[in-house]
Structure formats: structure tokens, C-alpha cells
Amino acid sequence: FYDELGSSDWRFSNKIHSTFSDKQGNLWICTHSKGLEKVTFRSVQFSMLTPEEHSYESLSNEVRALCEDKHKNIWVGLKDGRLRVYDANHKYLGFLTETGNVSLSGVPMKGTVYDITQDSKGVLWIATKGDGLVRAESVAPNGLSYKLSRYRYDEDDMYSLSNDNVYCVYEDHNGRIWVATFANGINYISKDKA
């Protein structure tokens, strides 16, 4: 698919940051300015979620990260710094706050999210640009309240992150969490510390 910018039938973004395929077989596309696009390979071909309608250049529509959690909620990391959460039916539930709650109000969790993954224990790992790595452990059965812990760079601690610009997080088959930073290498968190 390719659309000519500004044409009256412009429907899809030509600038894509990443893609994600969920457990239902949908393809989610993180775009630069058109928000989050969803391709469904069923009777309905496409649906689009745009956090800021009619404001295509808004940072609220620049999607950087996606993750589906064990509750089938979709976590959407936006360049504006908000980590939005949608349920399986695409209903907006709110954003992750500094206190660890998914809410429609409050102070957003600090950091532009570049990657999100859920490990085998159900813990969410949130990679941020400039604000380190956030570990979010669910404290509510509905998955809308979390205990947040932040891993940061500390020049006096050789076991801290090597950089606060975290771009990717991955869990290996041994349960270790691998953390890729911008220009300062890869770190890992052993499974007993995760």
C-alpha cells in the first residue's frame, strides 16, 4: 500500500516505525503521523485508531511501540510520551500513570516508549528513550494496576544500565531480560532479578 500525501483519498501512512502481529492474526502498523493502523484478515479489511483525530502531524499519532498483554490489552507507545492501553475491542482504557495505574487522568509515566514486551512471568518491560527501563508488575487481576520499578544508568554502579536510552527489550529461553541501549551496548537482567 502506498498513498500520495495530501490526496483526498489518503488513507494509510507511508512512514512506518514497526509492525506487530497479535494472537488473533491482526497486523498492527505503527506509523509516523497517522497513529496506529490495524489490518484484519477477515471480513473487515482495515480499521484505524488515531488518538488525535484530524491532527496527523501530532506526536500523539506517532506510534513507536506495541504489545499485546496476557489480558489481550494492546499497549501503544506514542512519541508524545503516553503509553496508551486499548482492550481487545479497541476501546481506549487510558494511559499508564506514574503511580502505575491505567487511567484516563493523572500524570503520565515518564518517558517516550520505544519497546514493550511481556515476559513469561507476565511482567511488562517498557523501554524508554532517556528514562531507562521500566518493570511493570501487575497488582490487579484485570491488568490495569502495576507496581513500577525503574532501571537507570548510574555512573557509580557498574551493575546499572549502561545508558538510559533503551530501544529494545527481549526475554530469552532462560528467562533473562536483554536490554539494548542506544550507543552503549546490550545489558541483561538475570531471571532471579527479573
Model-predicted segments: where are they?
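Carboxylate-rich, polar loop motifs that coordinate divalent cations or form catalytic acidic clusters
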Residues: 1-194
